[in-house]
């Protein structure tokens, strides 16, 4: 809505109107309506069929969710009345999908299964990794991997939240954006640990500070800056774009440099490079790519990153087990060697004491005889 306001405020109210002529279909017609930012009323042929939130400026209430409703055959007039006074998106951002009932249900089910698999698979990996770290007091790699998986699962869970219809205001978007920066913070820390010599230290520190700053910047923007300074929304978008370009190049270049220097960490570096590449592609294709069945570029690359880290964790765990087996075997050999050495020392001492006792017999006998004479 910013083009309608002199101060370029993205907040306001808008009306979308679409006229359709749908042929008779035994299967019926369904319309999938994605998130409408941030409150809306949906009318079909003048009849109100859905209402989410409150559009009034005075009593404004946000309610963002996905919706699915049927349309009649023949002439259809679709009206979507929207209002937004809180989010960096306004109105209809993602296109609705119209089709037969079976096609739309198949589409929605495939998408939900896809996101549920990504979410719960990574949560399972996180639980296993953190439990290993907690029970065995293992290395920091396990807890870092666990936090990474939890953050990715939170970041990927937004379709499930929107379809459940739970009204949590802007909190799901704060969680989605915040978890993204937690992932990048973990990646930055791991990159610094692996290739601190690839760049000057100031670059690593700048990347880490940028991630932490953006992590704090997200809730500050949603809860303070956007409501009281609407024009800041455009600045927020520019900051996000600069951040994505910088971090993607940082991860990719660092991975390429260190891969030639240390082949042992190739799995971790590959994960960094894949995720950095996904961030860059997502930025370059913004507004040009809309997933129909499955996910976005960063979501694919993020899952590949999790899989690469899974391989890294498995290799690390295998190496730890082999080291323990090696130490156990050599500990047994060491115990046997020490036992033989102690046995030999005891025998030598017995022989020494026997010789001393034998040498002392004659002087003792002479002393006893002398005492008897006295």
Predicted regions and their residues:
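Extended carbohydrate-recognition surfaces in non-catalytic/accessory domains of CAZymes
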Residues: 1-26
């Amino acid at each position: 809505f910013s083009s309608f306001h002199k101060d370029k405020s993205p907040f306001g109210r808008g009306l979308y109107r679409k006229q359709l002529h749908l042929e008779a279909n035994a299967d019926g017609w369904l319309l999938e309506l994605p998130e409408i930012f941030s409150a809306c009323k949906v009318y079909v042929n003048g009849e109100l069929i859905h209402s989410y939130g409150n559009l009034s400026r005075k009593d404004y209430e946000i309610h963002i969710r996905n919706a699915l409703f049927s349309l009649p055959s023949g002439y259809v007039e679709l009206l979507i009345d929207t209002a937004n006074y809180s989010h960096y998106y306004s109105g209809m951002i993602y296109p609705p999908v119209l089709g037969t009932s079976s096609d739309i249900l198949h589409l929605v089910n495939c998408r939900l299964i896809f996101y549920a698999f990504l979410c719960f698979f990574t949560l399972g990996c996180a639980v296993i990794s953190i439990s290993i770290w907690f029970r065995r007091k293992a290395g920091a790699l396990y807890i870092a991997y666990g936090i990474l998986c939890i953050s990715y699962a939170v970041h990927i869970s937004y379709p499930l939240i929107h379809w459940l219809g739970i009204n949590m205001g802007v909190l799901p978007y704060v969680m989605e954006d915040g978890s993204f920066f937690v992932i990048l913070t973990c990646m930055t820390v791991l990159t610094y640990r692996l290739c601190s010599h690839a760049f000057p230290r100031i670059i690593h520190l700048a990347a880490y500070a940028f991630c932490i700053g953006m992590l704090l910047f997200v809730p500050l923007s949603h809860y303070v800056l956007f409501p009281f300074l609407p024009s800041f929304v455009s600045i927020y978008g520019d900051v996000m774009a600069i951040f994505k370009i910088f971090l993607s190049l940082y991860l990719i270049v660092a991975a390429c440099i260190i891969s030639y220097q240390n082949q042992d960490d190739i799995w971790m570096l590959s994960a960094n490079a894949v995720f950095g590449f996904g961030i860059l592609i997502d930025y370059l294709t913004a507004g040009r790519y809309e997933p129909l069945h499955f996910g976005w570029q960063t979501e694919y690359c993020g899952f590949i990153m999790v899989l690469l880290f899974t391989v890294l964790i498995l290799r690390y765990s295998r190496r730890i087990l082999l080291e323990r087996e090696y130490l156990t075997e050599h500990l047994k050999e060491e115990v046997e060697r020490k036992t033989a050495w102690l046995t030999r020392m005891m025998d030598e001492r017995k022989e020494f004491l026997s010789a001393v006792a034998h040498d002392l017999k004659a002087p003792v006998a002479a002393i006893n005889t002398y005492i008897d004479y006295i």
